[in-house]
From Swiss-Prot, chains A, B:
The record marks D76 as: Transition state stabilizer. This is Uroporphyrinogen decarboxylase. Keywords: Cytoplasm, Decarboxylase, Lyase, Porphyrin biosynthesis. SUPFAM superfamilies: UROD/MetE-like. Substrate binds at R26, Q27, A28, G29, R30, D76, Y153, S208, H323. Transmembrane segments: none annotated. It is an enzyme of class 4 (lyase). Gene3D superfamilies: 3.20.20.210. HAMAP family: URO_D (MF_00218). The keyword Lyase applies. It catalyses: uroporphyrinogen III + 4 H(+) = coproporphyrinogen III + 4 CO2. One of its GO terms (cellular component) is cytoplasm. Belongs to the uroporphyrinogen decarboxylase family.
Length: 346, 346
């Protein structure tokens, strides 16, 4: 069963597999020396993520190093913004800066609908190259940011600690925010479809900042727009597995399960055994391993992987971290994570 | 029933009250103009929190402005550190800097046992003045940081994003970390007893960073040391209510309930109705209101308070935010929070 499909895709589709697939969020990046070397030559993040040769090369770095079961596009959740008329820059160690933060109706009404094949053709190019070259030895993953998280960026104008600007908008001018969220949902849905057509076999939606919402606000500003994105994708690609990740999601995992996604990617702040009970059995689970464990040693890493795996044996499970791998992680510890992960068996 | 006791203390003791008491975490601070003015004259945070006249004056600012049901000592969770031989400075907008971060056994073995009446007499002075002057029109609260959170500060050396240094110690040299946590638990227990003897009628333990631990690590590095602090306090003051707060606690609230505390202070990322089901009925609940709601308007603030209160009617409940009030919060919105909170009735 599923012998013709790569392991991660098979598992995500619910087919019987011999071991859980393994990949890492943010598996290409700063913790790899080869990436830091390339960054010296190409210091602009936007160039690295928007020049198709560079994005392709970086996407493949962890594949060459560790042979993970998933190869994810090297890109950023903000990459589609310029195609909607929102310009941004990423300043090393400071994060993204939105050129002209979105604060009023006029700005929202002037946003362009995203035409991915026009403004994001470099992404299509990278995904089709990855699909061809990875050649089903791994599964190619695409990804997007969810509407709430994109809205938080463009309203705040930068990485925020307190989200006071977008919350002010949410509580004072909810109609304005809903217009923005709706625009993003449609555009992001189109963008995911474009990624799938270009080669992505599994896609992940990051609503990184939805964990900053109370569950009552999640039901108004995050959940419905996650669902809208999923509905747009599933209407055309019902068979493509969709993963949803939220950082700080322990209070809303039941809600995540109701958005039409196939797999919930858990952070590490919830016991995966309890999460399995709270999430309907048809929905798969990914992640949950504290990325901080990779600052330990081989023994602690292996033990944590085993503990996590043992709690998920009767579930569809994809081994992953509970958050992106952290800068400063020793590469040999990432190696251990992949090596040990591949030794697991059902 | 409880007529002689202030409202918050009565409610915390489980006595029948006519309305939930209301106070705010970090209710004295940057959002108040009177505090910012004082800060101009006394720019050193350590001076403001360690000079008993200033600490007293600041503690009383919100009492004069809003008449909350609780008056909490103006201090910092790091304040006891110098009494253990760990020096620190707080740099405005950058947070605390530990002079000589704790990284090895020798440093841990050289830590002094805290003698609060010697090194923290200014805290005793402030609490006894507050107790006298507040005169049971409100309840006087003391507080401490829990061992894990203090350890995270002194090992990382500053506010951390990823906690890679303390996690490295936890996973590679757990014995070392346990020694440090044990030292803090004993000292912090003594410090709380000193606060109670000096005038604190209710005390709150902040394990602000325990939400960064997976539940499995929480059970090793956070929970047992919270419990140890509580045991030390309860041995001498079984009647003093103890509140426990953790930021990002949605995945561990059942565990918090097992530490011997009386009241769990919830952040806003969990539905309080679900939390009430997960927490044994004998344990009280505090908080849960998103501090971001105070960037909304009067109507949204009142509605949120009502929604929260309505979900807790059969529980011991203390109205509070789910986190400290945020810098930049309009003072009139804090006013609305207190005013509306005091209009609730059982």
């Amino acid at each position: 069963m599923g012998q013709d499909l790569p392991l991660l895709l098979s598992a995500a589709l619910g087919k019987k597999v011999n071991r859980p697939p393994v990949w890492m969020m943010r598996q290409a990046g700063r913790y790899m020396k080869i990436y830091r070397d390339l960054r010296e030559r190409y210091p602009s993040f936007r160039e690295r993520s928007e020049n198709p040769e560079l994005s392709y090369e970086i996407s493949m770095q962890p594949f060459h190093a560790f042979k993970p079961d998933g190869v994810i596009l090297f890109s950023d959740i903000l990459t589609p913004l310029p195609g909607m008329g929102i310009n941004f820059e990423i300043i090393e160690s400071k994060g993204p800066i939105i050129e002209d933060p979105i604060r009023n109706l006029n700005q929202i009404e002037n946003l362009k609908e995203l035409n991915p094949s026009e403004s994001l053709s470099f992404v299509g190019q990278v995904l089709s190259s990855l699909k061809k070259d990875v050649n089903n030895e791994a599964t190619v993953l695409g990804f997007v940011g969810a509407p709430w998280t994109l809205a938080a960026y463009v309203v705040e104008g930068k990485s925020s600690k307190n989200y006071s600007l977008i919350k002010s908008m949410a509580f004072k001018e909810p109609g304005l925010l809903h217009k923005l969220l709706d625009h993003f949902a449609k555009s992001i849905g189109e963008y995911l479809k474009y990624q799938i057509k270009s080669g992505a076999q599994v896609v992940q939606i990051f609503d990184s900042w939805a964990g900053q919402l109370s569950p009552e606000d999640y039901d108004i500003f995050a959940g419905p727009y996650q669902k809208k994105v999923v509905d747009i994708v599933k209407a055309e690609h019902p068979e493509t597995p969709v993963i949803l990740y939220i950082s700080g999601s322990a209070g809303v995992i039941e809600r995540m399960a109701k958005t039409g996604i196939d797999i919930i990617s858990l952070d590490w702040t919830v016991d995966i055994e309890e999460a399995c009970k709270r999430i309907p059995s048809g929905i798969g689970i990914q992640g949950n391993v504290d990325p901080g464990i990779l600052f330990g040693n081989k023994e602690s890493i292996k033990e944590r992987i085993d503990n996590t795996f043992n709690k998920t044996k009767d579930r569809k499970y994809i081994l992953n971290l509970g958050h992106g791998i952290l800068p400063g992680t020793p590469e040999e510890n990432a190696q251990t994570f992949f090596e040990h992960g591949k030794k697991l068996t059902y």
